[in-house]
Structure formats: structure tokens, C-alpha cells
């Protein structure tokens, strides 16, 4: 991590994600070693909010999570931010209510990847219209080789995406794309971001062509 920070410079944003994999003792050791690496955020360094609260006693690095338990976050003082997909919260309207509650409680929020172009268009609009979201949101666009919208898949330029300006969400459902993706799902099953069916046993190289 120190080598990465040195290579990208002090000003580049660096976020980490352990996907709840570390034990509390391991996380303590890791965070102690990278405390001076200017880490913007560490996502789910441990498996529970309770462990995260104990970890907070040993590190000032901000924590985030995909688990939308605001009540427990307020009680324990961690995580600092929620990173949530709109479908988890039940759609745009419920997401806006959740963000408003986060703001009232002083807990940060940014968006997890919208996956398809429809979900991504939704979170682009919400991010643009919601002042409480002031950190860059996540995306998995580099993994996408197809989409269900005529305008997709989205391709960021210099790490930025414009907000769609057409009516509604600003994107158009592609019936052909939907059929194509449906047939692929039936044939290959749930999409695996890591497995490349063209190269069994090897990880996909990013970005996908």
C-alpha cells in the first residue's frame, strides 16, 4: 500500500475494500501499517459494526459499508458512510428518504454501482440532485461488456459521466439488448465479474473489451 501511494502521489484518492474478510486482530495490524497512507475510506474492514466500532479505537481511517443499518450505525458511531445500491433500499423514493435520514444523523452516503444502465442512470440523477452526496460514487463499468439500454454501456471519460438529459431517467430500454442479456443469463448463469469463460482458470483483465 505504501508503494501504491508513492506511485500515485499524495493527491490521488485511494479507497480500500476488505469485503468483511479481516478478523478484528488482522484489521488492527493492517490499519496500523497504512495509517499514514492517506486512505480516503476503508470499506467493510471487518464483518460486523460492533467489530468496526472496536477498530475505530485504533484507527482514524473512515469506514463505509454496504449494510444499510442506519440505526445501529448511529448507536455505535460507525460506519462513517453507507455505500448502497438503490435496489437494496427499494427504489429511488426510498433511497431519497434513506439519504435524508443519513443527513439528519450526520452519516455519509454515496452510491454503489447501479450495474445496468437503468440503475446507473438513476443514481446519476440522484447524485446530481442531492447535496449530501459529495464523494465520488462507485461503479463497475470497467466490467461491463453489454447493457440493456440503447446508450450503454456507460463509458466514463476522465473518470466522469454526464447526467443523461433525455426525459425520465434519460436512457432508452433496448429490447434487443434485454433479450441478448436474458439469453446470456439463461446460458451462463449469474454474471461473474472475475471468471472469464473464454479463459477458464484465469481472472478477467480490466477493463473488459
Question: Each PLM stretch: what is its role?
Answer:
Residues 6, 57, 125, 179-180:
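Charged/polar, solvent-exposed surface patches and flexible loops
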Residues 24-26, 50-51, 92, 177, ...:
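Active-site-proximal flexible loops/turns
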Residues 34, 102, 130, 181-185:
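Alpha-helix boundary/capping residues
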Residues 169-209:
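Extended hydrophobic packing segments that form well-structured cores
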